[in-house]
Amino acid sequence: MPKKRRKLNKDFEKKIYTSKKNVELVLAKIYDIDDEDIQKEYMSAFNDVVYSYDQLKNDYELTGFNDNSDKLISDYIKAFSLFESEFEI
């Protein structure tokens, strides 16, 4: 039986790309922190954001744009906003 094609969405791909760049930027800033204890604190807080981004990216790569996509991007945005509000970087 032929494999079902993923449904693609260019606007959603742009959001994923922007999310990737935001995650990379914050991780670079965290790695630049000299104090190891503070760096660990920031990394543990940022892990939720990275996890949300990974779920978003993996879901899109495996199944494409679907009913769950909007929820995943919303979860990522909430996690990123929460991190930004609690930590100054």
Feature-to-residue mapping (PLM):
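Amphipathic alpha-helical binding modules
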Residues: N66-I89
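Acidic, low-complexity, intrinsically disordered interaction modules
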Residues: D37-S74
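Compositionally biased non-globular segments, especially hydrophobic aliphatic-rich helices
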Residues: N22, Y31, D48, N66, ...
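Positively charged, low-complexity intrinsically disordered regions
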Residues: K4-K7, K21, K40
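Short amphipathic alpha-helical heptad-repeat segments
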Residues: F12-V23, Y42-S52
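Secondary-structure edge/capping motif, primarily at the C-terminal ends of alpha-helices
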Residues: V26, I30-D37, Y60-T63, F87
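Short Lys/Arg-rich cationic patches that frequently serve as NLS/NoLS or arginine-rich RNA/DNA-binding motifs
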Residues: M1-K10, K14
